């Protein structure tokens, strides 16, 4: 399974009064990594929508191990951990660049839905060919 790593420098706006990255901002980092994963695999979200389906998030989880701070250079890894029926799960891990310790790990669960009626639909074969083990 393809795994990508994308970098992100923490701006001051992402931190809270405690001086650490606000917990909710990690979901935005997960989304950035998901988009880069799709792009690296040659199947962008824009193409998904043009082909008649979308992938809304229906569940998200994150385990916070250690905080990131202003100006940290982060590496966000992402990979598909499950494609089953109409479900897709993308796992993510966040580390400081050059360090092994995981700061945050988690995943997002998505459901394939039609752009016409937002009802669940099977994933296209092209998607399965790219992302399924």
Where are the regions a protein language model picked out?
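Residue-level recognition of the GNAT/N-acetyltransferase active site
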Residues: 11, 65, 96
């Amino acid at each position: 399974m393809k795994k990508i790593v994308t970098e992100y420098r923490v701006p001051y706006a992402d931190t809270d009064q405690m001086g650490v990255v606000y917990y909710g901002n990690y979901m935005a980092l997960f989304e950035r990594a998901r988009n880069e994963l799709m792009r690296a695999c040659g199947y962008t979200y824009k193409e998904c929508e043009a082909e008649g389906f979308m992938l809304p998030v229906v569940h998200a989880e994150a385990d916070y191990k250690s905080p990131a701070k202003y100006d940290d250079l982060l590496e966000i890894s992402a990979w598909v951990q499950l494609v089953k029926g109409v479900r897709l799960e993308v796992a993510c891990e966040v580390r400081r660049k050059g360090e092994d310790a995981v700061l945050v790990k988690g995943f997002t669960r998505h459901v394939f839905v039609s752009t016409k009626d937002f009802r669940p639909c099977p994933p296209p074969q092209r998607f399965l060919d790219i992302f399924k083990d």
